[in-house]
Amino acid sequence: MSQSPIQNPTSDPNAQSVQETSESKYGERQIAEGTLITFPNPRVGRRYDIHITLPEFTCKCPFSGYPDFATIHLTYVPDQRVVELKALKLYINSYRDRYISHEESVNQILDDIVAACDPLEITVKGDFLPRGNVHTVIEVHHQK
């Protein structure tokens, strides 16, 4: 059985490196365009909790530029509208290149979700991975 040799991408004259392409990838475009989308609550009048965990949150420290990593925990009681999950994922991913503090990022997430779906109650918790031997947990709450 013969195997074809593995081609070195740099030996292909038509290959382009990521740095050489000026067109953004479809995922980057979706993230850049990402806005929170909502839909009607299917059970208006019934009080229930929605728990969402987003374990891949990243942003950049506004002072050092180093990346910060966190798990974002959302718990909310919807009123008339519910946040669509793919839109929420793309919205969260939009923070990856932003220079923003732990405190501001968690507060901004809460403000944006409240503006999008006006829940009866919401808690947003950012559990940031330790950096420099410091572990930070930021929790904010809003209630009508």
Curated annotation (Swiss-Prot):
Q: What is this protein called?
A: NADPH-dependent 7-cyano-7-deazaguanine reductase
Q: Which HAMAP family does this one have?
A: QueF_type1
InterPro entries cross-referenced by the UniProt entry = GTP-CH-I_C/QueF, NADPH_dep_7-cyano-7-deazaG_red, QueF, QueF_type1
Q: Which residues bind substrate?
A: 83-85, 102-103
EC number(s) stated in the UniProt entry for this protein = 1.7.1.13
Q: Which GO terms describe its cellular component?
A: cytoplasm
Its lineage reads: Bacteria, Bacillati, Cyanobacteriota, Cyanophyceae, Acaryochloridales
What are the alphabetically sorted keywords of the record? Cytoplasm, NADP, Oxidoreductase, Queuosine biosynthesis
Reaction(s) the record says it catalyses: 7-aminomethyl-7-carbaguanine + 2 NADP(+) = 7-cyano-7-deazaguanine + 2 NADPH + 3 H(+)
Q: Which PANTHER family match?
A: NADPH-DEPENDENT 7-CYANO-7-DEAZAGUANINE REDUCTASE
* Residue ranges with Polar residues bias: 1-21
**Enzyme's top EC category:** oxidoreductase
> What's a BP term from Gene Ontology annotated to this protein?
tRNA modification
Superkingdom of this entry's organism? Bacteria
Q: Which GO terms describe its molecular function?
A: preQ1 synthase activity
Q: Where in the cell is it found?
A: Cytoplasm
Q: State the family named in the UniProt similarity comment for this chain.
A: Belongs to the GTP cyclohydrolase I family. QueF type 1 subfamily.
Pathway(s) annotated for this protein in UniProt: tRNA modification; tRNA-queuosine biosynthesis
**Principal localisation:** cytoplasm
Query: Has the keyword NADP been applied to this entry?
Result: yes
UniProt-annotated stretches for the region Disordered? 1-27
Q: Check the record and name the Pfam families matching this protein.
A: QueF
Purpose:
Catalyzes the NADPH-dependent reduction of 7-cyano-7-deazaguanine (preQ0) to 7-aminomethyl-7-deazaguanine (preQ1).
So where's the catalytic machinery, residue-wise?
Answer: 61 (thioimide intermediate), 68 (proton donor)
